[in-house]
Regions:
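Short-chain dehydrogenase/reductase
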Residues: 7-8, 77-80, 84
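C-terminal beta-strand-loop-alpha-helix "lid" module of Rossmann-like NAD(P)-dependent dehydrogenases
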Residues: 40, 44-58
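A conserved structural motif in NAD(P)-dependent oxidoreductases
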Residues: 48-51, 62-76, 87
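Conserved SDR Rossmann-fold cofactor-binding beta-strand/turn motif
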Residues: 20-30, 84, 97-99
Length: 108
């Protein structure tokens, strides 16, 4: 929450100088550590890492999202590249969810 407040405060303070400030809130994201974590859980559960991930992102799982898969770190990178580009000048002071559609609440 404090990072969100800092984002909004900075956006207010530096916007007049043409600087944008945003906060990316990623969901469960595949990184270089993901395989190790999935393997550990698979060993505990007695199934394969692929089965662990399939269960995690199956409909009805508390870990799933609307696209039923883990977000890849490159997808967060694409969003970051857009926000750093001149094409995103109108986006500032925002918390941008990039989790594949987690949750059903509307925040505005």
């Amino acid at each position: 929450v404090s990072l969100v407040h800092m984002t909004k405060t900075l956006a207010t303070q530096v916007g007049k100088f043409g600087i944008t400030v945003n906060c990316i809130h990623p969901g469960t994201t595949r990184t270089e550590r993901t395989a190790v974590m999935l393997e550990a859980r698979a060993k505990e559960m007695g199934i394969t890492p692929q089965e662990v991930e399939a269960q995690d992102f199956a409909d009805g799982s508390p870990r799933t999202n609307h696209i039923n898969r883990m977000i890849d770190a490159s997808e967060i990178g694409y969003l970051t590249a857009y926000l750093a580009s001149d094409k995103s000048w109108a986006v500032t002071g925002e918390v941008i969810m990039a989790g594949g559609g987690t949750g059903n609440a509307v925040y505005y």
